[in-house]
Amino acid sequence: MAQKDDKTKDKGVKTRRISRRTAIKTAGVLVGAGIAGVPGALTRGMSVRSAAAAEKPIKIGFQVHRTGIGAVYGRWYERTTTAAVKLINETGGIAGRPVEVVAEDDGTDPKRGAEVVEKLAVQHKVDFVYGTLFSHVVIASAPRAGELKIPMFVASEGYHVPSGTLNRYVFQPGITDVRSQTRSIVSWVLNNLGKKATMIFPDYAFGYDHRDFFGGAVREKGGTILAQLPIPPTETSFTKYFPRIPADTEVLYHVMVGPGVLTFVKEMGEHFGAKRPQIFGFIDSLEGVDMASPGLEFLEGTYFWEGLPRYSDGYPTPYEKFFRQRVGVNDEGASIQDPKDVSTYAHMFSCWETLFVIKQAVEQSGYRDRTPKDYKALIETLENFQWFNEGIQHPQGHKKFIGRIHQSFGQQFVSEVRNRRLKVVHRTKIEDSLYPTEVDYTKQPL
């Protein structure tokens, strides 16, 4: 892909113009383009709720990690989905039709993931499959979506979508991928923390993306990877891994998920004590975990990537504030109802944004039913999208969408742990994350 094709242009929505044939679609445009900059503007859609209710619902099949190692994410992905669908239905639904979510737990298990896709498509007859997160589940589920010829919208971060290894029915428009995330922050890490890095990552596809792309970017920028340590995601004790970290490590890069992440951080602190290298982690290691938890004192002065800052002062825009309020999250990143219930705030916006992308694609393509013709129109329409404006539909920020690879690119945040909180110290630009690729899903038959 030529670099000139990837230059970011903050000049409005470059998708095909939405039809204004009905008041319902007009309401969709106001929200979608970010014109509705204040929540009050959304109330204009309330009068069309009764009309939407009379239409056949659009059914979205939600492949959710209610159990297994992804359960904490699944819980907040489900809350975010509920909040987004509630807002969509309050403002006229999608193309004048109410949205109904059919959720099925995949146990964060690859085998069950493929079964869930089939159940949603064949038994529940949903229009689309949506919401899959963990990489190994996405990789196992996506081929079944392709075989069933049903669009699948994942919220995963993995490089599996833009890599071209999946199929034309799978999109990731609501969150950026690991390759772009690591590419965008690597210069900051090398310039501010050190050039000799050791990596600790989970031993499955998501971790391999970090291994390959952060490691590759470090070498490309003149740094050195001293060691790479994969750890099984179900591991519960980590003391045997830390002695393998080379003594001359300047930066320890970690990204861990699963039930043992709190133990991982505590044991890392016990191992290093005061004589530690600089530490940079992906907040995946502590999503759903209170930064003031006992044992995390060791993290003071370390750094994390965040997709969207957990604390409200990290990115205080009216759109982020509106999103935070609608999903029920307080200024500290925890549930308003239960402050001990910490959100997965750096990731869960992807559900919100993806659902609004589905809304735009349906309305602009004229999609009505589960027919090959309508699916073709929807897929081709989405592949022609180029830009998602920051706004109520996209509170994390502007997104550049490259239809050939079915992937969005956006800004990232680097935060430092200060006084048991995360303080944003750096925000990347979209162009920092762009990479060359020859992938082109649009050439695959439907």
Task: Set out the residue ranges of the language-model regions.
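Extracytosolic ligand-binding ectodomains
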Residues: 2-7, 14-30, 38-446
